Amino acid sequence: MVCIPCIVIPVLLWVYKKFLEPYIYPLISPFVSRMWPRKAIRETNDKNKGKVDYKGADINGLPTRGPTEMCDKKKD
């Protein structure tokens, strides 16, 4: 036996997607695009694209820029 929310939630999502979204989305999309602006994607023609310099790698393996230092003291 299937629980009631397992039936009702997909039906409500289908009704929203099929009938309500075409009317609601044009009203909401200008606000969403202001909140989450798209950033331009730049393609680089770098010859060293696959090579990574591991000298400045952080503890978790992510490359960092500039010197990294660990402070044990709190700064007030």
Curated annotation (Swiss-Prot):
Domain of life: Eukaryota
A Pfam family hit: DUF4512
Major subcellular site: endoplasmic reticulum
Annotated spans, Necessary for its localzation to the endoplasmic reticulum and lipid droplets: 1-37
Keyword Endoplasmic reticulum (UniProt): yes
Subcellular location: Endoplasmic reticulum; Lipid droplet
Keyword Endoplasmic reticulum in annotation: yes
Coiled coil: none
Keywords: Endoplasmic reticulum, Lipid droplet
Regions of compositional bias (Basic and acidic residues) in chain numbering: 47-56
Function: May activate the NF-kappa-B signaling pathway.
Family: Belongs to the UPF0729 family.
Name under which the protein is recorded: UPF0729 protein C18orf32 homolog
Originating organism: Bos taurus (Bovine)
